[in-house]
Amino acid sequence: MSDSHLTAFDKASKAGFIIALGIVYGDIGTSPLYTMQSLVENQGGVNQVSESFILGSISLIIWTLTLITTIKYVLIALKADNHHEGGIFSLFTLVRKMSPWLIVPAMIGGATLLSDGALTPAVTVTSAIEGLKAVPGLSHIYQNQTNVIITTLVILIVLFGIQRFGTGFIGKIFGPVMFIWFSFLGVSGFFNMLGHLEIFKAINPYYALHLLFSPENHRGIFILGSIFLATTGAEALYSDLGHVGRGNIYVSWPFVKMCIVLSYCGQAAWILANKHSGIELNPFFASVPSQLRVYLVSLATLAAIIASQALISGSFTLVSEAMRLKIFPLFRVTYPGANLGQLYIPVINWILFAVTSCTVLAFRTSAHMEAAYGLAITITMLMTTILLKYYLIKKGTRPILAHLVMAFFALVEFIFFLASAIKFMHGGYAVVILALAIVFVMFIWHAGTRIVFKYVKSLNLNDYKEQIKQLRDDVCFDLYQTNVVYLSNRMQDHMIDRSILYSILDKRPKRAQVYWFVNVQVTDEPYTAKYKVDMMGTDYMVRVNLYLGFRMPQTVPRYLRTIVQDLMESGRLPKQEQEYTITPGRDVGDFRFVLIEERVSNARQLSNFERFIMQTKASIKHVTASPMRWFGLQYSEVTLEVVPLILSDILKLPIKELVPVEDSEA
């Protein structure tokens, strides 16, 4: 990796600063919309809070942002980049060779991040629209919560509906809008604080610890469930590392943290000034002059949409990485934008829309959604902590120090998890069920792949070179295709799946000029595109190992065209001149791709558990993208052959021949 690349990644710029605001901080930047509201409502309303409660709450928020977001994610996790990419799956690829069981926290963390994130659009957009209740002239309309729900659903329908067309055209305004948003948070919070400068005392962690054990705190330790709402977007700082670079996050985070802390302090000051007024509005909107509220609601809605868009795009990236790591079913992926980073997965898009819409309809108010929000993300953070410990050890940190540092963060996050566990009975169960469903699918997919690797028998290609050469030269068989390509998941040295050789020689002898055996391997580097060729001492058998990064599309025909051209130019592969063609000088023949689908056979080597895994995986495959689409073969000639899962040492089933008995009287 060149020094120039490292410098660009670690360097900050004005443009990068603005871009980071629009991509990275949508979730954590919209938390002021609902965090203080949740704290006040759970305490019994504005008239039930005291100065010590407010100071303690603000202190808890400040130190939660400092410990989890600043120290863990900004100062530690951002250094764990995988060739400039971040996120839990990127972190997993860095440490997966250290222990096979690390796939478990990676799957759990990915599933909980995906499931809890499905609530973000519902919470943020609903909170923003509820701000219309504080707008003179519109309050009488939006006091009816049904109108809030309808408006929220319309926004969500439009937001999810435009994903298929790409969002690059609106992405350009994300940064400037979020800059205005954060500036407003900071300025309004600062002016609200001027009359209550005692809020600055909240910097002292004493107030945070005192509140946890104070009788004034009606919820005890469970207050941390609401406090955690302030930092739910911390994981995004790490996940979006590759989009904006480490340097831009280092520079932009202090600005963002200052603005959101000022917003929380400003809301706290307004609460102290109005705790006897009986006002029951969201402190975020109520703390702003009434004549500015309509503009604030508009700005808050834009910020909520940007936060939701960041979540949706992040979900697509997360699922795409899981598919390439072979721990998630293959779904159709399209690229509506101008670059590979703008991808779209239709199935995931509409599942997210369904979950988000059902959340709005089921919970109705943002307050009820907040009661369920944040539970699963605490698990994601715990899983990231586990993987980070292994990363620190891998990078040379003394094991005892790595254990101590990560044990501290694990303890803090586990306390937040316990505090959020009460949310399970208030709607958190929906998020947990969704997370468990995703983990189940991941487990089935991963376990099914391991079972196939365990039982499928491989043969040495060298033992069949002569047979394949004889078939190639045997004019008794019609030419099946000039080039026949087999895609194999399992190809090591000269060993290859027996089903492939069975297809060439036994099922129907396939005569061709060149036989291609292609294996696609996903590398730890996100944007690798390399290949290795072994001609096996022939000019008619080609073994190709494609090494593609876990963020690269696996469009095999495009890569194969380049490889064929390279081999012909180097003289390793004879030119395949065409007698009939509309392309003058064409020297590459036609290609046919043969895909082999393995299905569960009735052989008795499979245990009941293994059979359940394989049958469940087969059922899931019915709703996933076909290998033809996944490998970019839609416009190629493709043959699909179905074979039973070939097992080693197949057991013979006993059977006897019935012999006719001669008539005794004959």
Curated annotation (Swiss-Prot):
User: What is the first-listed, main subcellular location in coarse terms?
Assistant: membrane
Give the UniProt entry's GO cellular component terms.
plasma membrane
- Compartment annotation: Cell membrane
The membrane spanning regions, by residue number, are 16-36, 58-78, 100-120, 149-169, 173-193, 221-241, 253-273, 294-314, 343-363, 373-393, 399-419, 424-444
InterPro entries recorded? K+_transporter, K_trans_C, K_trans_N, Kup
> According to its UniProt record, what is one Pfam family this protein matches?
K_trans_C
The UniProt keywords, alphabetically, are: Cell membrane, Ion transport, Membrane, Potassium, Potassium transport, Symport, Transmembrane, Transmembrane helix, Transport
**Membrane-protein topology:** Multi-pass membrane protein
| Reactions catalysed according to its record | K(+)(in) + H(+)(in) = K(+)(out) + H(+)(out)
Q: What GO annotations for molecular function exist for this entry?
A: potassium ion transmembrane transporter activity; symporter activity
User: What is the documented function of this protein?
Assistant: Transport of potassium into the cell. Likely operates as a K(+):H(+) symporter.
Q: Name the PANTHER family for this protein.
A: K+ POTASSIUM TRANSPORTER (PTHR30540:SF83), OSMOTIC STRESS POTASSIUM TRANSPORTER (PTHR30540)
Record family assignment: Belongs to the HAK/KUP transporter (TC 2.A.72) family.
Annotated HAMAP family: Kup
Entry protein name: Probable potassium transport system protein Kup
Instruction: Identify the species of origin.
Output: Streptococcus pyogenes serotype M3 (strain ATCC BAA-595 / MGAS315)
- This chain is encoded by the gene named kup
